[in-house]
Amino acid sequence: TSTLTFTLSEAATDFVEADATVTGGSLSNWTAVSSTVYTATFTPTADSTTDGVISVSSSKFSGSSGNTNNDGSDANNSITFTVDTVRPTIAITDDDDDNSLSAGDTSTLTFTLSEASTNFVQSDVTISGGSLSNWNAVSSTVYTATFTPTADSTTDGVISVASSKFSDSAGNSNTDGSDANNSVTFTVDTTTTPSPSPSPS
């Protein structure tokens, strides 16, 4: 959010929040600090890259003598914010055709981010039924790792990334922690059949 200050050249009693033209977001917390100074909070639209623009057109309010304002096109009568409130997402894929792992099997996982990130790390990944190794940043949007199922186990291997684990260059944290493409599940059977005991001669 950003706090905006509207400074009038003369006192006015009829300058109100509705006099401000707002795109790409909304105003709140409108406050008359004095008859010439007003403040408000600008909040950009969620999940958007549309610039936020706040301005006041001419003839929106008047001074004590009844003269209406006339600087609707002046440069200091408009503020523009570059906005990026789009939260990055992630998709996880694997190289195993049937998602079934036996003793000695491993699978290469690929984590594909919708936006570049510099703080996505292995510890952001939630793992059960096995472990990750060989973490590799192929690029700022693609990461790979090797999943190894737990030995002597029939517990499914599950790999996922929860929301709010990493962020993009604008500081937006990731979302879609519960999306279907944000989790991979392996059927695991790494139990081994014991070798038969030799028969007595």
Whereabouts are the PLM-identified features?
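Non-catalytic beta-sheet/beta-sandwich ligand-binding modules that flank or precede catalytic cores
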Residues: 1-201
